[in-house]
Regions:
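Phosphate/NTP-binding elements of NTP-utilizing enzymes
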Residues: 1-353
Length: 353
């Protein structure tokens, strides 16, 4: 087994054995992967995990390894790690290897939709931007249409902007794949592929022929318009991917919670859908949100991009300021709250009366 695939399997095993502190949804996502490795271990199985494939020039590659190695040749673009090469953490390798490693007999990906829910600060945009560049230039798709989509222009440009900066800081990437970086899009003339940011504000979203559609922060979408457009647009290709990565929110009647509910039922084995990947980082029911272990449990990038010296004081502030609790729980513990209104700890109120 390759280094990346082995790392992904080891992460899953450590999660399932409770060596790594995670919530039930991460445990179930890892258990699903481990079960699938057994279920589809025969070469005649419906799916193969990270097999050796041949490109159009007869060169061999393994899909999970190819993606992970590609991403680790790209730079960070923000914060203290800016300009340093990305080093994927085990949880990221697990997600990437699982989504991209499973293929059908024709080499096309098993997973057509991916839902990743994780608290703020866990390098969501960095991961999505890097995957977007891969899908633009290295996924062996002619005329690939890659989009970062959102309800607003500013939100849509976050992932695209990070990818744009990555490309500008990576002359090796631009030269290897002949990528042209413009102000509003990136394109590869040789393959007719492009990467753009699109929003529901002033953009015509109908009729898109999407190879990779990235929806960042789906919880902020008040309607299902963008999601439905991407789901329809990716249906026009046979190796496309709808990639959703988001934090929790408050709208339990919206499209994000609908997709989340679908994923939780899938992870609970209520039904099977071999085209959907899902993983949700957060807390379990009954966990004490004021405990430090809860911060570690909910944030897979703890100690890397999520720093104790920043998050612990925010937790302490929320413990003393009821109006800050909802925001803290949602953004930093990935907990869906019932409303945007301030949360009131009635026990604290009574105790201080």
């Amino acid at each position: 087994m390759s280094t990346y695939a082995a790392s992904a399997k080891q992460y899953a095993e450590r999660v399932v054995s409770h060596e790594i502190l995670t919530c039930e949804w991460v445990q179930k996502a890892c258990k699903r992967q481990l079960d699938d490795l057994i279920r589809f271990k025969r070469k005649s199985s419906l799916y193969q995990f990270n097999p050796e494939l041949l490109d159009r020039y007869g060169r061999s590659y393994r899909p999970a390894d190819n993606l992970c190695a590609f991403i680790e040749r790209l730079p960070h673009v923000k914060g203290p790690l800016a300009s340093k090469m990305i080093v994927l953490e085990p949880w990221q390798v697990f997600i990437l290897s699982t989504v991209f490693g499973w293929v059908k007999s024709d080499g096309k990906r098993r997973f057509r939709r991916s839902y990743i829910e994780v608290p703020r600060g866990n390098a969501k945009s960095t991961l999505s931007s890097a995957v977007g560049l891969y899908m633009l230039a290295a996924d062996r798709e002619g005329g690939a249409e890659v989009y970062s989509l959102a309800t607003t222009r500013d939100q849509a440009r976050i992932v695209f902007g990070d990818a744009q900066t990555m490309a500008r800081l990576s002359p090796g990437f631009r030269n290897r794949f002949a990528v042209n970086v413009g102000a509003h899009n990136m394109h590869v003339l040789q393959t007719g592929s492009k990467f753009e940011a699109l929003s529901a504000e002033g953009s015509t979203l109908d009729g898109l022929n999407i190879h990779f559609g990235c929806i960042d922060e789906l919880h902020a979408h008040k309607t299902r318009t963008v999601y439905d457009v991407v789901e329809t647009g990716t249906g026009k290709r046979d190796n496309s991917l709808l990639w959703v990565i988001t934090t929790a929110g408050s709208n339990r009647s919206g499209i994000c919670y609908e997709v989340r509910s679908f994923v939780t039922k899938l992870l609970n084995r209520v039904f099977e859908d071999d085209s959907q990947f899902g993983i949700i980082y957060g807390l379990d029911e009954g966990d004490d949100w004021t405990a430090k272990d809860s911060l570690i449990k909910a944030n897979p990038n703890w100690g890397i991009s999520v720093r104790e010296e920043i998050l612990v004081p925010l937790q302490a502030k929320a413990m003393q300021l009821p109006s800050a609790v909802n925001n803290f729980k949602t953004k930093h513990l990935n907990e869906w709250v019932s409303a945007d209104t301030a949360w009131m700890d009635m026990r604290s109120w009574d105790a201080s009366a």
